[in-house]
Structures are given as C-alpha cells and as structure tokens.
Amino acid sequence: ELPANRGRILDRNGLILASSVPAASIWAIPEDVDQDKPEVRAKLKELARLMGMPLAELQRKLADEDKTFVWIRRQLDWDIGQQIAALDIPGIYQRKEYKRQYPEGESAAHVVGFTNVEDKGQEGMELAFNDLLAGRAGSRRVIKDRMGRVVEGVGEVVPPMDGRDMQLSIDSKVQFFAYQKLRDQVIAHKAKA
C-alpha cells in the first residue's frame, strides 16, 4: 500500500489548522532480532534511546519470537526514523506514514477535531469530511524477501490520490481570542462545564 497524504484544513485566510507531515513507524519481526549478539544489544539500546522508550519495554516487545510482526512505535518524527534506519538492525524495519499536526492547538480543536493513529477522522471536521480529506491509498504489487526488502515489482503501480484541502469560514485569529476569553472566564468562575 502506498499511503495518500491527507488534505489540509485551512481557516478563511488560508492559515493552516491541520496538516500532515511524514512520520516513521517502527516494526519488527522478533525472531529475526538476535538479541544474543553484543553488537545487536548495543544497537537496541540506542534504538530505545532514540524512541524515548525504556530498554526493558523494547526487549519485552521483541521477546515473543512466535510473533511474525510487532509494532514497536508509531508515528515518530521522520528525522528520528532516519537515524533508526542508519542503525541497520536486522529484523527492525520502518514504514512511512503521515502524522497530523494542529498548529492552532486547543483554540480550534472543537471545530477541527482530530484523527487516530491510522489517520482516520475521529471528531469535528476530520470526521465529518473524512472521505474528502483522506484521499485514496495507492498500491503496487511486489515480491519481498524474508527480510522485508523489495526484490521485484510485479504488475502495475496505482499511485495514491492525496486528500483534498478544505477551507473553513472561521478566522483562526478571532477564534483564538474568543477561546482565550472563554478559558479565562472558566478559570475565573471555577466553572466545571
């Protein structure tokens, strides 16, 4: 599967309320990670550090050698993914995905909504217009070796169709000030709802 880039959500002035950035998701074939080798153990320690994960948690995820696939960490920053790829640990792989960013944060969250780790809309405009924003994933048929490397392409490549951008009628600056005033009053009056 070739992932499509989700469309952006913009305010009426074209300022970005939601956009997608490349992210690296790390996965493993536990039986292919030889934790008995000192050089692999050293690389796993560095992998855990790069991901901000305790080494014990990483080792636990890799302990079940009966599993043929396990996610280690989803949607890491792309540059961290490149550092992980440079470690070249046998049995550890990565997949390019997209991660949503919301520059306006809480001030527009109730309108914009959010997506889950699978990049599907869960609330707000992200949910209501999921089909428009999501686009369509592409595909290509390939033959892979046991290490997950592409050996040969077979058949045609269907390119992904990126999602469409959506422009809202709200003004993010006005929204920000209204949100601030509302938040200040909630705090001042110790409101619970």
Predicted regions and their residues:
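Membrane-interface junction motifs in transport/secretion proteins
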Residues: 1-7, 22
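Short, small/polar residue-rich loop motifs at catalytic or cofactor-binding pockets
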Residues: 2-4, 137, 189-193
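Conserved, well-ordered alpha-helix/loop/beta-strand core segments that scaffold catalytic motifs
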Residues: 69, 151-191
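Short, conserved charged micro-motifs
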Residues: 34-42
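Generic short beta-strand
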Residues: 6-9, 141
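Hydrophobic (often cysteine-bearing) scaffold residues that line and stabilize catalytic clefts
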Residues: 6, 40, 170, 174
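Small/polar-residue-rich segments within soluble enzyme cores
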Residues: 18-23, 28, 42-49, 60-164
